[in-house]
Amino acid sequence: YYEGSLSTLCAGCGHDSINAAIVEACWQMNIEPHKVAKLSGIGCSSKSPAYFLSNSHGFNSVHGRMPSVATGANLANRDLFYFGVSGDGDTASIGMGQFVHVIRRNLKMVYLVMNNGCYGLTKGQDSATADAGSKNKTGHENLFAAIDLASLAIELGATFVGQSFSGDKEQLVPLLKAAMRHNGFAFLNVISPCVTFNNNTGSTKSYDYVREHMAATATMDFIPMMHEIKTSYESGSVKDLTMHDG
């Protein structure tokens, strides 16, 4: 009911761990799959929606254009929950303009980037999120500074930003649940190692490197249920509000 078709991704791909976390989060939240619309672009990550929530709606768009499709679908049907899946190539290169403006619109959706720092479908070239100095499978060293998607989302005013690792299910599942509860644009950047082209010594997106350099900034083991805070005010006026944490 919550799972999808059999994955055709490489054995050990971080994306499959993210798919499993999405299944777990949706099951824990009792989200009905037929009320979910999955949207994606092009890339290994964009194949992933086929591997979870098989009874949901889905649309595989052209490269980098998932946000536009999500915007149109959201305007046409406000009753569905929109889950966008993208990759670092799909978002940080050809889709960068779309990414910027979907944040600007504060579209109500979860936008998840499966970030492996390379183009897995085209033999592992460095993507725009590959760190300077990181080495790929051929030993080539990346000379360019990485685009930090989480920092960029914060700078652009995204109302929910989170970052995690595909190998840390205990953090990722609660983070997904928090993003799904958010009333607005929720962005998740998940480091997801490519076992075929970018899991080698010298890569900063490998399983070993990420595990050695992980640093949790907060615990995500409990997400309290809260009532949505609403108010009304005259144009040009200011009203003080008390948030849940006081």
Residue ranges of model-derived segments:
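Flexible, low-complexity linker and terminal segments
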Residues: 4, 194-246
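Short, hinge-like loop/turn segments at secondary-structure boundaries
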Residues: 55-57, 102, 127-131, 179, ...
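Short catalytic-loop micro-motif centered on adjacent basic/acidic residues
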Residues: 9-11, 84-86, 160-165
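ATP/pyrophosphate-binding catalytic subdomain of soluble kinases
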Residues: 159-213
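Active-site diphosphate/adenylate-binding microenvironment
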Residues: 2-62
